[in-house]
Amino acid sequence: MNTFGIQITSIADEINAQVSMHDNTTATVIGVIDTPVKVAGTFSVGTVSTFTADNTGKLTYTGATTTTVQFAASVTLDVVGTNQDLTIQLHKNGIAIPAAKISRTVTSGSAGNVGLFYNIPMTASDYVEIYVANSSSTNDITVTDCLFGVS
């Protein structure tokens, strides 16, 4: 609080959320080639402020103002089969964000990691989740490790 009785806060300092998942063995079932599916597994909820988070990896904005937030994800993928083209993609309110995705070729037993950063405008109750897709086959994808958050 300054000498005039005004408290100045930075909204950037108040917005954060993180979920993580390590050593996951639950496969995400891929029913259709190149169709994103929400990541399967149980996430641990970390520190949150102006967001809520749950053990499915869903981050929900609870702020009173509309703001743009940077989402960051580090995802390690494994799959059955060779040379499988896998994609991670952010979905807002259950709808794919077309540009918020990145792909990598992965072979069984040789897990691959990808990082994704994307700015998303958020209003109260908007939520973001991570989805995966296999554009090579319907082989299931296991997200063995995942860090997902906002800052």
Short names for language-model regions:
Residues 65, 124-126:
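Surface-exposed loop/turn positions
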Residues 70-123, 131-139:
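Terminal beta-strand-rich extracellular "head" domains
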Residues 2-82, 101-102, 117, 138-151:
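Terminal (often C-terminal
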